[in-house]
Amino acid sequence: AGDAAAGKTLYDASCASCHGMQAQGQGMFPKLAGLTSERIKTTLVAFKSGDTATLKKEGLGGPMSAIMAPNAAGLSEQDMDNLSAYIATLK
């Protein structure tokens, strides 16, 4: 299971500039608040591995994938668990 406090630190440093401080989305960057931790983790894993089939199934994988993929590439399994735990607390 992920550590939401550690996830918040990582989110604030790496995700908030595009997705917003409360994950409400900004412009072309999607809202993450309200998603389950499972969906967030699945999506992060897909971005990291380049799994375009899963991204398309999730309604993702458009032009913004070029921005998201390198961000996900550096995440460890624990980072993804922590981010998923934190983002799932946001409504």
From Swiss-Prot:
Keyword Metal-binding listed: yes
Annotated residues for binding of heme c: C15, C18, H19, M64
Pfam families: Cytochrom_C (PF00034)
One annotated GO molecular function: electron transfer activity
Alphabetical UniProt keywords: Electron transport, Heme, Iron, Metal-binding, Transport
Disulfide bonds: none
Top-level taxon in the UniProt lineage: Bacteria
Post-translational modification: Binds 1 heme c group covalently per subunit.
Keyword Iron: yes
PROSITE patterns associated with the record: CYTC
Subunit structure, interactors included: Monomer.
Cross-referenced PANTHER family: CBB3-TYPE CYTOCHROME C OXIDASE SUBUNIT FIXP, CYTOCHROME C4
Protein name as it appears in the record: Cytochrome c-554(547)
Phylogenetic placement of the source organism: Bacteria, Pseudomonadati, Pseudomonadota, Gammaproteobacteria, Chromatiales
